[in-house]
A protein has these predicted regions:
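Active-site nucleophile and cofactor-binding loops and adjacent substrate-binding regions
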Residues: 14, 18, 68, 154
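PLP-dependent aminotransferase class I/II
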Residues: 64-75
Length: 236
């Protein structure tokens, strides 16, 4: 494509989880003319195997952590080899899924950016908060009761009560419709049963944390049952 340097986000398109499901990875690829200046040592072929090449006179030298999460790179590389040109088809379906959800939810949540999206789009619970006191956090917590992992919330920061929706290419239409129904049900509950949303999740083993108490009285050290155990850990 004519680029000198390309940064790959291995999240999603190249198989890696993201955020709490991470780790992600961001390898950087360069043209051959730039390769001599890369951090050293470089991994180079040596017969049937590989070796570290330290003889790099033009290299910028060692860079802390420059190899990154190596296992992530291997997994993504294998993923690319396995799917080949089908990666484009997978990306097309991810974009289609995102626009399908956008079209089905735009009438019940605020839509800060009213246009076709790529692989993700942003909704806002601004009206729910203004009219019923229900926040993006409440929506996310209630989704857990529907068996759905909550989306990223409060990002981007410029969108109040943001909900970033990012379906993948692997979701069936039935699962997409299930997500839509859950989101629409939650919007209806905001008007009829706001306190239910404020207490959500109600069916999970772990309930909602008391965020006010956590902020005012944080517990940053584990409370041991036996003083000897605490002393052993502190002294190594």
């Amino acid at each position: 494509m004519g680029f000198d340097v390309v940064h790959y986000n291995l999240h999603k398109t190249f198989s890696q989880p993201h955020g709490g499901g991470g780790p992600g990875g961001g390898p950087v690829a360069v043209r051959a003319e730039i390769e001599p200046f890369l951090p050293s040592p470089l991994v180079v072929r040596a017969g049937d195997g590989f070796r570290l090449d330290h003889d790099r006179p033009k290299s910028i030298g060692r860079v802390r952590g420059f190899a990154g999460p190596f296992g992530v790179f291997v997994r993504s590389y294998a993923f690319m080899l396995a799917y080949g040109t089908a990666l484009k088809d997978m990306s097309d379906v991810a974009v289609l899924n995102a626009n399908y959800l956008l079209a089905r939810l735009r009438d019940v949540y605020d839509l800060p950016y009213d246009r076709l999206c790529l692989h993700e789009f942003v909704l806002s619970a601004r009206t729910l908060k203004r009219e019923h006191g229900i926040t993006a956090l409440d929506v996310a917590k209630r989704l857990m009761d529907h068996g759905i992992h909550p989306p990223t919330i409060y990002f981007p920061l410029v969108v109040p009560e943001a909900l970033m929706i990012e379906p993948t290419e692997t979701e069936t239409k039935e699962r997409l419709d299930g997500f839509v129904e859950a989101m629409r049900s939650i919007a209806a509950e905001a008007a009829s049963e706001p306190e239910t949303l404020k207490r959500a999740p109600l069916t999970r083993p772990v309930r909602r944390l008391d965020e006010v108490k956590a902020a005012k009285d944080p517990v940053v050290r584990h409370a041991f049952d036996h003083p000897a155990e605490a002393a052993r850990i502190e002294t190594g």
